């Protein structure tokens, strides 16, 4: 068990409800989750079970109906959208289950693209991407 000083991400009581007309659907109910530095976690469930919704809440891409998400001790819902984006870009990354390479880009540019999105200069991103490709033998 890791110490609380290594706590990276913490969620308490996360609940998400969607309202559409007369439909009131609770997708997540009172989810608690702690992720410490070095932890590896998997979120597994059937299609439509709320996995993507949970990840969106944890990353501040959507707001919970109830509950809190702390990233390095900061309540992300209390931050401005710009501050949320900065925190997300610094500490989080998203890989969706239907990811794909962009055929119009080289392998190097496909690897560098997330760094460009995080506003890393093109040359620095390509150097980092080349180093990553070399580490995995590509």
Across the structure, where does each feature detected by a protein language model lie?
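A short, flexible loop at the N-terminus of ABC-type nucleotide-binding domains that lies
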Residues: 4-8, 17-30
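ABC ATPase NBD coupling module
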Residues: 22-25, 76-92
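Short beta-strand immediately N-terminal to the Walker A/P-loop
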Residues: 41-42, 94
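The feature captures the beta-strand-to-loop junction immediately N-terminal to the Walker
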Residues: 44-46
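Helix-to-loop junction immediately C-terminal to a conserved catalytic motif
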Residues: 59
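ATP-binding/catalytic-site motifs of ATP-hydrolyzing domains
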Residues: 68-70, 74
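Conserved ABC ATPase "signature" region
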Residues: 74-75, 123-138
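Short coil-to-helix segment of the ABC ATPase nucleotide-binding domain corresponding to the Q-loop/switch region
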Residues: 105-114
């Amino acid at each position: 068990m890791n110490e609380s000083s290594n706590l990276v991400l913490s969620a308490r009581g996360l609940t998400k409800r969607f309202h559409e007309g007369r439909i009131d659907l609770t997708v997540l109910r009172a989810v608690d989750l702690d992720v410490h530095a070095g932890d590896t976690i998997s979120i597994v469930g059937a299609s439509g079970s709320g996995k993507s919704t949970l990840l969106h809440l944890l990353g501040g891409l959507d707001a919970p109906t109830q509950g809190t998400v702390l990233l390095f001790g900061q309540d992300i819902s209390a931050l401005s959208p710009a501050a949320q984006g900065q925190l997300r870009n610094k500490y989080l990354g998203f890989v969706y289950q239907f990811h794909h390479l962009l055929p119009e880009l080289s392998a190097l540019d496909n690897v560098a693209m997330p760094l460009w999105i995080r506003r890393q200069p093109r040359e620095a991103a390509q150097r980092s991407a080349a180093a990553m490709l070399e580490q995995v033998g590509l």
